[in-house]
Regions:
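Alpha-helical structural context detector biased toward long hydrophobic helices
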Residues: 7, 11-13, 17-29, 38, ...
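Extreme N-terminal basic, low-complexity initiation segments
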Residues: 2-6
Length: 248
């Protein structure tokens, strides 16, 4: 969702790199966000894609504790508010497996009355709403803005085959299952920027490309997320069944 190949130093068509299992992509020894080095700060490993989204690829000693606390907040929002139900259904890795619920709520409308029903995971219908907006303002030649032009969402969903029995519907009875998402475009955009930024560092090194305002955007100091993050507003291609995610 990031026009990143065109933004960072004019680099396009980044080579595809495949990782399997827990992998160190690069050893940095400096905070990639604020610049603190190992002499000044306790540095932690930084996942390119959040661990909560299934990633095991990381930059070693790449974030100070203060910056890690900032990135953790928007990554938790993405993992819980946007991908939360999807992660539970798919059994995506978590650092707190004992806290994973055995039931999830569904938002149901029957005969004009809306209510919530707790369902076991195998009976639970869910939605995944991925925010999307227009191409980055930088690529469109417009001034930085806090607006998200064309903001909408790609909506994916799963309805189990036994939904009639799960909702205890009688023959001919119709139920409307409604999305129940609260994704925030700013936090989602910062998470996408962080993935793109870390991926560029993995490929080119910390000093191998022009950062522009990306570190400040990721840390929340540059408020114009849509100036550097965006997408072509079109239907996404079919997912690659051979991998969990693709960064390009």
């Amino acid at each position: 969702m990031v026009g990143f190949g065109s933004i960072v130093g004019g680099i396009e068509n980044l080579a595809t790199r495949e990782y399997r299992g827990r992998t160190m992509a690069r050893h940095i020894k400096r905070c990639i966000y604020c610049g603190a080095d190992s002499d000044d700060a306790n540095l932690t490993d930084e996942h390119i894609v959040a661990y909560s989204l299934g990633s095991d690829v990381y930059l070693k000693e790449a974030s100070c504790v203060a910056c890690a606390d900032i990135t953790k907040r928007f990554e938790q929002h993405v993992a819980r508010a946007i991908f939360g139900h999807h992660r539970i259904h798919k059994g995506t890795q978590t650092r707190r497996p004992n806290e994973r619920p055995s039931q999830l709520p569904a938002r149901i409308l029957i005969r004009g009355v809306e209510y919530r029903k707790e369902l076991v995971i195998t009976d639970h219908p869910y939605f995944l709403a991925m925010p999307i907006w227009d191409q980055p303002g930088l690529l469109r030649g417009i001034s930085p803005s806090a607006n998200f032009d064309g903001l909408c969402a790609h909506l994916y969903y799963h309805i189990p085959d036994n939904i009639k029995d799960a909702l205890e519907l009688s023959d001919g009875e119709i139920a409307e299952i409604r999305p129940d998402t609260a994704g925030d475009a700013t936090q989602f955009g910062r998470a996408i920027a962080k993935i793109a930024y870390c991926n560029a560092i993995a490929h080119f090194g910390l000093d191998g490309f022009e950062h522009l305002e990306l570190p400040d955007l990721i840390l929340g100091k540059f408020p114009y997320v849509s100036f550097l993050v965006g997408s072509v507003l079109r239907e996404p291609p079919p997912p690659n069944r051979d991998g969990r995610y693709t960064v390009s």
